Structure formats: structure tokens, C-alpha cells
């Protein structure tokens, strides 16, 4: 069995969901998208009142889709709060380092984004005239 790539911690009715794949700069793999969807479902069913979405490591919040193991089942949109997972609790994204492509979409579907001085947002799809449907 593969080690979890999403962690869920709860304290004082505040959930912290962490993308935990720093060795791959938190690239969004199929496993990660599945676990993230499950974490948001857990949040919805819990007594937690708010969620902080963050990422492990110091180089990237996430570099977007993992090109060697892209999200396919479920698709990337299925882990987006309020789109693929219905939530009535606020999600606060805490961003550091690179935030690229699908990760940028994930941040945009959060209720609030807080970025530190290292944050670098980039949506490469726009450079080639493609929008994956999440931002459009």
C-alpha cells in the first residue's frame, strides 16, 4: 500500500489538510486527488468549523498535475471545494512557493487565500490558449 499523501489534523474545530508530497513538489497525482477529495468529505462530515489547506516542504504549495501520474480517476475537478466536493465550511489556502496549474485552481476555489512572500502563481495553460474548464 502506498503511503498517504494528504494528512488531516483537527484541533479546536480547525482542520488542517496538508498536501504531503514534497519530494515531488506536491504534484497532483491520481492518489493525491482521491485523498484530497476524501479529506474534504471528512471535513464536511466533521465538527470542524474551518479548514486550512497547506502543503509540506518549502519549495512549492504544488506544481500542478503530476505529468507521470496525472489525475484521471477521479478527475482533478472532483477534489475542488464547492465543485467536486460540496462544502459549507470555509477553506483557507495557505500558499508558499510555486502554485501552478491545477493547484492554482484549487486555491481559487478556496474561500480565502493567504500567500507568503515566496508564493509564485502560474497558470501555464493560458500561454497556449487552453483553459481546462476550471477557471473559465
What residue spans do the PLM features occupy?
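Glycine-rich acyl-CoA binding loop
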Residues: 25, 29, 103
Amino acid at each position: 500500500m502506498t503511503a498517504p499523501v494528504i494528512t488531516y489534523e483537527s484541533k479546536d474545530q480547525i482542520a488542517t489538510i496538508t498536501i504531503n508530497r514534497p519530494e515531488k513538489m506536491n504534484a497532483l497525482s491520481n492518489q493525491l486527488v482521491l485523498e484530497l477529495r476524501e479529506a474534504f468529505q471528512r471535513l464536511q462530515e466533521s465538527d470542524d468549523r474551518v479548514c486550512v489547506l497547506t502543503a509540506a516542504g518549502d519549495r512549492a504549495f504544488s506544481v500542478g498535475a503530476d505529468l507521470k501520474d496525472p489525475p484521471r480517476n477521479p478527475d482533478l475537478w472532483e477534489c475542488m471545494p464547492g465543485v467536486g466536493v460540496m462544502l459549507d465550511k470555509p477553506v483557507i489556502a495557505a500558499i508558499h512557493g510555486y502554485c501552478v496549474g491545477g493547484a492554482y485552481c484549487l486555491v481559487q476555489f478556496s474561500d480565502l487565500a493567504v500567500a507568503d512572500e515566496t508564493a509564485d502563481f502560474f497558470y501555464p495553460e493560458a500561454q497556449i490558449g487552453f483553459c481546462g474548464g476550471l477557471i473559465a
